[in-house]
Amino acid sequence: MTTRQICTLPRQCKLRKADEFRAVLRNRIVFESLSLRLYVKPIDVDYARIGLIVAKRVERKAVRRNRIKRLIREAFRRHRQMLMGLDCVMQLRHPVELLDSTRIYQEAVMLFNKAARQL
């Protein structure tokens, strides 16, 4: 039998409460790309956390909203080592085509790189 690596995002790496989101959004360290906006706040822990905002008015279909969130979570999971000690909130700014999933992933990675370099 082969062993399979579990590739999930731990629960501690997710922002869940409204107060946690508010704290990051109030901090106002912002990085932007064409369709995404990343809010960042330094924290005193040895891991990174992420929260996602994909509003219904920006993307009407739930399937698309969920797909976008999965792509961003995967980008975060793969690059969270460089974001240690940061709370991040990623927000979708404009509607995007579902076929542009590689672009969404690349923009998320670019914003994570930018935040890691500057903080």
Curated annotation (Swiss-Prot):
Record's keyword terms, sorted: Endonuclease, Hydrolase, Nuclease, RNA-binding, tRNA processing
Domain of life: Bacteria
GO biological process: tRNA 5'-leader removal
Hydrolase keyword on record: yes
InterPro entries: Ribosomal_Su5_D2-typ_SF (IPR020568), Ribsml_uS5_D2-typ_fold_subgr (IPR014721), RNase_P (IPR000100)
Annotated GO MF terms: 3'-tRNA processing endoribonuclease activity; ribonuclease P activity; tRNA binding
Annotated catalysed reactions: Endonucleolytic cleavage of RNA, removing 5'-extranucleotides from tRNA precursor
Function: RNaseP catalyzes the removal of the 5'-leader sequence from pre-tRNA to produce the mature 5'-terminus. It can also cleave other RNA substrates such as 4.5S RNA. The protein component plays an auxiliary but essential role in vivo by binding to the 5'-leader sequence and broadening the substrate specificity of the ribozyme.
Quaternary structure, from the entry: Consists of a catalytic RNA component (M1 or rnpB) and a protein subunit.
Family: Belongs to the RnpA family.
This protein's name: Ribonuclease P protein component
The species this protein was found in: Nitrosomonas europaea (strain ATCC 19718 / CIP 103999 / KCTC 2705 / NBRC 14298)
Gene: rnpA
